[in-house]
Each structure stands twice: as C-alpha cells, then as structure tokens.
Amino acid sequence: MRILLSNDDGYLAPGLAALYEALRPLAEVMVMAPEQNCSGASNSLTLSRPLSVSRSATTGFYYVNGTPTDSVHVALTGMLDAKPDLVVSGINNGQNMGDDTLYSGTVAAATEGIMFGVPAIAFSLVHKEWAHLEDAARVAAEIVRHYLDHPLPGQPLLNVNIPNLPYGELRGWRVTRLGKRHPSQPVIRQINPRGEPIYWIGAAGDALDASEGTDFHATAAGYVSITPLQLDLTHTQMLAATRDWAHAGSGAS
C-alpha cells in the first residue's frame, strides 16, 4: 500500500509529523507538503511562477514553495511512478467543519487527490492546540487502516474532525453532514507605519447550524466526525427553478 501525505500547515508542522509516524506501520508513505503555512489557501494552484521541490535533510519530507493543492498536484503528476492507494491530508491545527471546508487548504489537498482519481481523507484536530495530538494521530491511523482494509466504493473524499480529547474520552465515530457558520467577523482595519490602511481578515463566525447530525454537534459531544464530501457543486434542487427562470428570461428578450 502507498499513501501520499500532505497538509496545509507546512512541512515542519507537528500535525504532519505525528500523522506520518502513525501511518508508517500501515503503508509506504511519501510526504509532499507546502514549504510555508498555507491555511485558508483553499484549492488554489500557483500559475504565475515555476515551483521548486526540496527535501528536508532531517525528516526526508518533500516540500514545495506553493500551496497544498500544488503539493499534491506535483507529487501525483510529476514525481510518483505509480498512483498511490490513498491521499491523506493533515493533521490540521484547528477544525475544518461546516463552511470551513470551502477555505481549507487541508481539505483542498485531499480534494486534489480526488481530481486524479485517488481516494482521499482530510484530518483536522478541533481547537488550535496540540494537547492531544498523539491521540488524534492514533485515531487517524485507525480510520486509514479501516479504509485500506475495507475500501468504500468509488473515490471517496472524507473530511474527518477529531475532538481535542484524550483517546479514552473519545466516544467513537459519527458520520455527519456539514454544519453552517455565521458570516465571519468584519475585517480589522489598521494603519501601517507609512500611514496607509491595512486589513486583517476577521475571526470565523460562530456555528449557525450545529444541530444533531452535523459535524459541529458530533465533535462537541466527543465523537469523531466523518463527513463524505463531493466535488460536484451543482445545486440539483435548484435546477428546475433555474430552468424556468432562464426560459422566462430568454423568452422575454
């Protein structure tokens, strides 16, 4: 078995190292990650300049001076001799639930695997601290082992969020849907030393839909949240109404 491992926190991130060590007994693991922290990079590709790949002298991890998506793209299309059995991303420093998934570089790295027909799993640790990172890595390895032993049909994309709890306090796995957040806080406006305005993106909004069945609800109750995602963004329930709307508009012109 072969696993391609990436993340969005960068190749020096503790979450990447912990997940690598947890996955090594399960498969041959190649690491290709961004050189820098790319949180919030989403599915962006670097198209305006060439990319360079380096290798850490201490860990052997490969890293690219680009985005999480760049990392997986370069590995799959330019470095690996054969397609891996699984792309794994994480462990992220902080949750990726609800609307977070649209911005997440962690999820994006996994998504790039799906783009090339490779099943993928993204792992995130709820709350921005590493207090129970080794426990989270243990859970991640259990999920990966279960997938390798019992693959889901097709090319699944799973988004996994692990509560920041000791292993013994975790209550199991829950399959969930994405919750929803309130809009993020307004940007923070400051003045730089030259007297020019600068802006910081505000904090993420609180949970709006954290009802039973959502990722927010499951992790708050101590469960590991597993949410199957898809690339098709088509709003199928709006197709009929949109056809009627478009037909009325084209007939009026």
Curated annotation (Swiss-Prot):
Top EC class, one word: hydrolase
Any one of the GO CC terms: cytoplasm
Amino-acid positions noted as binding a divalent metal cation in the UniProt annotation, renumbered to this chain: 8-9, 39, 92
Co-factor(s): a divalent metal cation
Molecular-function annotations in GO: 3'-nucleotidase activity; 5'-nucleotidase activity; exopolyphosphatase activity; metal ion binding; nucleotide binding
The record's free-text note on cofactor binding: Binds 1 divalent metal cation per subunit.
Stretches assigned to coiled coil: none
Compartments it resides in: Cytoplasm
Protein name in UniProt: 5'-nucleotidase SurE
Organism encoding this protein: Burkholderia thailandensis (strain ATCC 700388 / DSM 13276 / CCUG 48851 / CIP 106301 / E264)
